[in-house]
Regions:
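Small-residue-rich hydrophobic transmembrane alpha-helices
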Residues: 12-76, 112-131
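Alpha-helical transmembrane segments of multipass membrane proteins
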Residues: 1, 22, 117-121, 144-149
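Interfacial/gating helices of multi-pass transporter permease domains
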Residues: 2-21, 90-99, 127, 161-163
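Short alpha-helical transmembrane segments in multi-pass integral membrane proteins
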Residues: 38-108, 151-203
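Hydrophobic/aromatic end-of-helix segments at the C-terminal termini of transmembrane alpha-helices
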Residues: 1-6, 34, 75-79
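Short runs within selected transmembrane alpha-helices of multi-pass transporters and secretion channels
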Residues: 27-32, 105-124, 130-139, 146, ...
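Hydrophobic alpha-helical transmembrane segments of integral membrane proteins
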Residues: 139, 143-157
């Protein structure tokens, strides 16, 4: 759909995604390792530890998002210039496009961290359908319809692509919070049951 704004916009969006990957790839790496740890502890009945792992992961992912936002905000013009430079040619228009798109997209770094931590917990507890729902919603509910709206009902230019990415990434984090709250309530119930059983056995 971004092709509506021209081939150069598609290229700029690809570069913007690559720049975003400097931060979000850390989230992905944490997700893979943490989901396995959460699953192992859940299998051992150590529900309190799974909750602790999730909270630590959430804190780390949010810090990564904040750090990424600060660093990329400071270095975005330079990063864009690197990607806009070929062997014998520098394209200032392409560089400006990259900056225009990513200055919006990067505002979702923190909420993507929240989304990543939530997915780790859901995968660790075997909530694969909820995980799929969040991933599908991010693209087909929060991204495609938003870009379609901008293209049909506004005069916004290629900057709409960056705003769409921002909306999609922020909504992904908000929806993850909405999904994870009832899951956390269930885990807390299991912890209380575990502690009650332990006290009964001690008696």
């Amino acid at each position: 759909m971004s092709g509506m704004y021209g081939a150069l916009t598609v290229g700029a969006l690809g570069v913007s995604n690559n720049i975003g990957g400097l931060t979000t790839s850390w989230h992905s790496g944490m997700l893979d390792g943490a989901s396995a740890l959460i699953s192992q502890n859940r299998g051992a009945g150590k529900y309190r530890r799974t909750l602790q792992l999730f909270l630590w992961l959430m804190a780390v992912d949010v810090m990564i998002g904040v750090l990424g936002l600060v660093l990329v905000s400071a270095g975005l013009p330079w990063l864009a210039a690197v990607f806009a430079q070929s062997k014998n040619h520098y394209d200032p228009a392409f560089c400006e496009m990259i900056v225009s798109i990513h200055r919006w997209e990067m505002l979702g770094y923190i909420t993507l961290g929240i989304n990543s931590a939530t997915l780790a917990l859901l995968l660790g507890y075997g909530y694969t359908k909820l995980t799929l729902l969040l991933n599908v919603a991010r693209v087909f509910l929060f991204r495609v319809p938003v870009l379609w709206f901008f293209q049909r009902f506004t005069e916004m230019g290629m900057e709409a692509v960056g705003i769409t990415m921002m909306v999609s990434n922020i909504c992904a984090g908000v929806s993850a919070i909405a999904v994870v709250i009832p899951v956390l309530v269930r885990i807390r119930k299991k912890i209380r049951q575990e502690e009650t059983c332990g006290k009964t056995l001690d008696k």
